[in-house]
């Protein structure tokens, strides 16, 4: 008989609001028991009954920032799997138009951060993948991210195809226990346990 796993499924939205080449980032430092404790993320939250992704993100942004979005794009669907015990389907948005006055957020501290400096923040490894996709203006995408119980990224797939993952090493060649996607490794210049070999074909002048 086929084994059926019953997993808790959540629905959520996340939005990165852009202004003057900066993203509005939320530093999650308020709640003690927070899976995102000390991480930097975008603005968003879980669906309320009967909401569409657009209705959810508009409400969450208003509640957490005080802003009303006037121009936004639905960029992708991110599937999170946490240690085979919980799943989350997250609708990812970006916005470049808003109005209203900012308010304090009870989820953390809001801060405008230069987009190029976002990579230096304490981010989830999977978030770096969709940041790269956003930076490259990839059309609407489906991204799957699988995490261990310890919060380590173990697997990623883009539009149903597995992405290449590298084990990051330190300067002495020792494993760090961190796994990064190929594009993120190249973006950050991280050391990894692979080597690239180029073969030169002799020409007439080489003898």
Predicted regions and their residues:
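Conserved hydrophobic "DFG−1" position in protein kinase catalytic cores
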Residues: 17, 25, 94-95, 112, ...
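Unchanged
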Residues: 47-70, 80-134, 155-163, 204
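Acidic, metal-coordinating catalytic segment for phosphate/diphosphate chemistry
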Residues: 2-14, 161-204
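Conserved Nudix-box catalytic region and its N-terminal flanking loop in Nudix hydrolases
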Residues: 23-59, 63, 149, 153-160, ...
């Amino acid at each position: 008989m086929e084994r059926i796993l019953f997993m808790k499924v959540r629905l959520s939205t996340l939005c990165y609001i852009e202004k003057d080449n900066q993203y509005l980032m939320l530093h999650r430092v308020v709640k003690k028991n927070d899976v995102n404790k000390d991480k930097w993320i975008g603005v968003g939250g879980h669906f309320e009954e009967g909401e569409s992704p657009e209705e959810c993100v508009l409400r969450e942004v208003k509640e957490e920032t005080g802003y009303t979005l006037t121009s936004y794009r639905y960029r992708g669907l991110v599937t999170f799997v946490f240690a085979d015990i919980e799943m989350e389907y997250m609708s990812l948005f970006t916005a470049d138009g808003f109005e209203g006055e900012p308010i304090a957020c009870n989820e953390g501290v809001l801060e405008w951060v230069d987009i190029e400096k976002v990579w230096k923040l304490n981010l989830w490894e999977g978030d770096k993948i969709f940041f790269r996709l956003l930076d490259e203006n990839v059309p609407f995408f489906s991204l799957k991210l699988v995490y261990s119980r310890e919060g380590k990224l173990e697997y990623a797939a883009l539009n149903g195809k597995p992405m290449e993952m590298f084990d990051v090493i330190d300067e002495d060649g020792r494993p760090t226990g961190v796994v990064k996607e190929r594009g993120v490794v190249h973006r950050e210049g991280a050391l990894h346990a692979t080597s690239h070999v180029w073969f030169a074909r002799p020409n007439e002048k080489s003898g």
